[in-house]
Amino acid sequence: MPPVSFAAASDPAPRSALPIGVFDSGAGGLSVLAELQRALPQEDVLYLADTAHVPYGARSDEDIRDLTARAVAELVRRGVKAVVVACNTASAFSLTHLRERFELPIIGLVPAVKPAVAATKSGVVGVLATPGTLRGTLLADVIRQWAEPAGVRVMQAVSTELVPLVEAGKADSPEARVVLRDVLEPLAEAGADQLVLGCTHYPFLAGSIRAEFGDTFALVDSGAAVARHTRNVLSRGGLLRGGDRTGEVSYLTTSDPAHLRALLMTLRPGGADGASLPDPPSPRIELTTT
């Protein structure tokens, strides 16, 4: 398949005026969106939630690559200047393929093992992730690069239940706390003092994690680092939008717009006490296919 060129987008606006595309399997990428809006408040964003196919974590490698490519192609078709793949599972399997196919910056997520290794005092770091992220190579690569030379033990915890709970609006619920207690108790017993949130849905579980484990773990995620990296990539490419303005966010979803709207009103990165997403009361949400 030939590369998809940025010039194929139908929007005639200058490249710097185009929005940043953000993609996730569902609502998890909203935690990354919140960081992008803090780091790049002047930028417009087009967010695509592939909620018809969430969760990605238990899907086959081929399915993950195909769904991710279709979603990114839809963002490119609508006209974006860069794409942030705000999904750890999609990043684990698709970044190389996406960068070969699409001629615009593709920014992915890397599990935040490096800062967790730097911060640990116990020498034990936990990683909470989906089966897909644990199956991919990105996590193994960063463990090999940062944890092993430092002599830090990395313990992995996996769940297929947490993403559906967040998507159902139950991030701060008894059901979520039961699952978290089961999967994280072995990490706490082993002395982990840092917990890498290896899925963009998981910052929304911070309140439930703290309710069960108090300050046992410092919670570490990639959102702020990805936002800084996006700003640097746009700056190097002359793609930063100038002017004193506040960017707008538009949303695409592959299933129920009303459900995504409800999640936008309730989800808070960092848990129940976190700041709400800085979105308008009635966000523009369009149903799409990929």
Swiss-Prot record:
Active-site residue list: C87, C199
Chain positions recorded as substrate binding sites: D24, S25, Y56, G57, N88, T89, T200, H201
SUPFAM superfamilies xref list: Aspartate/glutamate racemase
Enzyme class: isomerase
Presence of keyword Isomerase: yes
Record-listed E.C. numbers: 5.1.1.3
Keyword Cell wall biogenesis/degradation attached: yes
Alphabetized GO MF terms: glutamate racemase activity
Pathway in which this enzyme or protein is active: Cell wall biogenesis; peptidoglycan biosynthesis
Any single GO BP term: cell wall organization
Entry keywords, A to Z: Cell shape, Cell wall biogenesis/degradation, Isomerase, Peptidoglycan synthesis
Catalytically driven reaction(s): L-glutamate = D-glutamate
A Pfam family hit: Asp_Glu_race
Annotated stretches, region: Disordered: 271-290
Superkingdom to which the source organism belongs: Bacteria
Function (record text): Provides the (R)-glutamate required for cell wall biosynthesis.
The family this protein is said to belong to: Belongs to the aspartate/glutamate racemases family.
Protein name per its UniProtKB record: Glutamate racemase
Source species: Deinococcus radiodurans (strain ATCC 13939 / DSM 20539 / JCM 16871 / CCUG 27074 / LMG 4051 / NBRC 15346 / NCIMB 9279 / VKM B-1422 / R1)
